[in-house]
Structure formats: structure tokens, C-alpha cells
Swiss-Prot record:
GO terms for cellular component: cytosol. This is Uroporphyrinogen decarboxylase. The gene is hemE. It comes from Rickettsia canadensis (strain McKiel). The keyword Lyase applies. HAMAP family: URO_D. CDD domains: URO-D.
Length: 339
């Protein structure tokens, strides 16, 4: 039995553990491979290298899940949108400004995403049978905000202003991304992923009305469409920074697993775990400290969530400067936890 799926099967005796960005720049073996390829998107499409870095943290830490090495921006890139990654800057994109910009988006991915699906198939063959494989995509609002801003996370004035002033056009772009995201997720499961995750990293910048329109409704549509085809596939949703709107999200979106950030009180996580499986929510910065602090902060979470429907994770991704021994210590502490 795959340990990560234990809460779904009503078995919460052992707490599953994996970490966002567990394959990444904090690992020396990752850095060694990253040095061999200049362009980040080429890296994401390289079947052998992306497979290897997906498996690296599993070999090192034996996490209960592997998450495929990819990026939320491979989808717009595969659809013809101009996306590039600049060193020490991050993603730079063609900026979506008007109806005319739809001409730069294609109706299909022209097989560009086939390499992602090949990576999943290859990882699946090499992954231990007890380890879950997570496929993922960026939620439509987050991908859309990158397209509207033309770059990585800013103050979101540009994207929010666009939405306020161009509601119909915004909905048209949103619906386009809903369809393509659904297609991408289904293909990942058909290639071998057995859990899916939707990352909505930018959801916390929206007021309630826009949060409902651009986060809740799109996520709900995607999940319902995926479940029509793949009713048994668990789906994780991560509306990062949603704050009080997490409550509304849980009530209205038919998710299996809710990932939460470190700002959410533990008692809320405990309360929500009666309705959904909760995943989170250690502050990634804690892993930059020492073993005593890591143990203290992990204990605070574990003693509240032990026996609940819970997956241990971080409130966001592992930071590049994280010491590898701290990740090992935390993982072993979670596995051996007893009150």
C-alpha cells in the first residue's frame, strides 16, 4: 500500500511525509545535473535528466511521494506562449494585454508536453512500488497572473487591474486555461501519476469576489472534469495565502486533500481534517535553523494532527539554502513521532 494514500483509506496510524520542491537546488546531486543544461525549460523537457532529479530525493530520503520535476509554466509554453527563465531573475513571459493576444496561443500543445508524460512513465518504472507519484499543474489564476504580469510574482497590480477592467476577456482566458489544465492533468494520470496537485500560488492576492470567480470556480470545474474521467484519482489543491477564504474553498471545492500554508492556525487544520485530508504546514524557514528548533516546530504540528487525516509537508517549497541534514532530520523525526 502506498503510504501517502493511507489517510484516503482511513488509515492515519502513520503520518505520510513529502516536501514541496523536494527535488531542487538544496541537493548537491541536483546542482551537478543542473550545471549540465543551461535553459531551465529544456531541463524540464529532458526525459533522462528530469527523471533523475525527480528520483534523487526519493533515493536520499525515501519520501512517501515523488512529485514530477516540471514547472507550472510548461503549459502556456507548450501552447505557444513566449516563456523564458532568466538566471537570478526568474520567468519572463510575453505579456497578455488584449483580445489580439489569443493569436499567440495555440489550440493544442503540438506534442510538446509528450516529453513530460514520457518523464512520468520513466519515473513510474523506477519508483518503489510503495511510493506515490504526484503530477501537477498551475491553477488557471496563477498561470494567468504570470501571463498578465509578464514576469514572476510581483505586487499583482497589473493582473488585478486587468481583471477589474476586462472581466469578459479575463474569463475567456481563464476558461481557455481551465480546459488545457484539465487535459494536462488527465494525461499525467494516464501516464502513471496516481495523485494530482493544483498549485494556486497567487490566490492570496484576490478579494473574496475575485477569489470565488478566479480560484474557487476554476478549481471546481477542473476537479469535476478530471473526476468524470478518473473518479478514483486523489487531487490536492493549494490555494496559497487564502487566509479566511480557505473555509469557503473547502465548502465549495470537492477536493480530496487541502494543502495549507504556514499562516494557518493548527486548530483550524485539525478542524478541517474532519472534512478533508490536510497537508502542511511547517514554515520552510524552520529548516534553515537547527535541530532543536526543527524538532520543536514539527512537534507543535504533529501533536495536534496525530491521528487526524493529515500529510506532513511544508507551507511552501524547500528553500535552496536548506541544509540537507536538516531535511533528513525532520523526515526521520516525523516518521518516528510519538507523543
Amino acid at each position: 500500500m502506498k503510504q501517502l494514500l493511507n489517510p484516503l483509506k482511513g488509515n492515519s496510524d502513520k503520518i505520510p511525509v513529502w516536501f514541496m520542491r523536494q527535488a531542487g537546488r538544496y541537493l548537491p546531486e541536483y546542482k551537478k545535473i543542473r550545471e549540465t543544461i543551461k535553459n531551465f525549460l529544456d531541463f524540464c523537457y529532458d526525459v533522462n535528466k528530469a527523471t533523475e532529479v525527480t528520483l534523487q530525493p526519493i533515493r536520499r530520503y525515501h519520501f512517501d511521494a515523488a512529485i514530477i520535476f516540471s514547472d507550472i509554466l510548461v503549459l502556456p509554453h507548450a501552447l505557444g506562449w513566449e516563456v523564458d527563465f532568466k538566471e537570478n531573475i526568474g520567468p519572463i513571459l510575453r505579456q497578455f494585454r488584449s483580445q489580439e493576444d489569443f493569436k499567440y496561443l495555440q489550440s493544442d500543445t503540438n506534442n510538446k508536453l509528450e516529453k513530460v508524460y514520457k518523464i512520468i512513465k520513466k519515473v513510474k518504472k523506477e519508483l518503489p512500488s510503495t511510493t506515490s507519484l504526484i503530477g501537477f499543474a498551475g491553477s488557471p489564476w496563477t498561470v494567468m497572473s504570470y501571463m498578465l504580469e509578464g514576469k514572476g510574482k510581483q505586487d499583482f497590480k497589473t493582473s488585478k487591474k486587468f481583471v477589474y477592467e476586462n472581466k469578459a476577456l479575463s474569463k475567456e482566458l481563464l476558461n481557455f486555461l481551465i480546459d488545457k489544465t484539465t487535459y494536462h492533468l488527465i494525461n499525467q494520470v494516464e501516464s502513471g501519476a496516481n495523485i494530482l496537485k493544483l498549485f494556486d500560488s497567487c490566490s492570496g492576492v484576490l478579494a473574496e469576489e475575485e477569489f470565488t470567480e478566479f480560484v474557487i470556480e476554476p478549481t471546481k470545474k477542473i476537479i469535476l472534469k478530471v473526476k468524470e474521467v478518473l473518479p478514483k484519482t486523489p487531487i490536492i489543491a493549494f490555494p496559497k495565502g487564502a487566509g479566511l477564504l480557505y473555509e469557503k474553498f473547502i465548502k465549495e471545492v470537492p477536493i480530496d486533500i487541502l494543502a495549507v500554508d504556514q499562516m494557518i492556525p493548527l486548530e483550524k487544520m485539525k478542524e478541517w481534517s474532519d472534512k478533508v485530508i490536510v497537508q502542511g504546514n511547517l514554515d520552510p524557514v524552520v529548516l534553515l535553523t537547527n535541530k532543536e528548533i526543527i524538532k520543536e516546530k514539527a512537534y507543535e504540528i504533529l501533536q495536534v494532527m496525530e491521528g487526524k487525516n493529515f500529510i506532513f509537508n511544508l507551507g511552501h517549497g524547500i528553500l535552496p539554502e536548506t541544509p540537507i541534514e536538516n531535511v533528513e532530520f525532520l523526515t526521520e523525526y516525523v516518521r518516528s513521532f510519538k507523543k
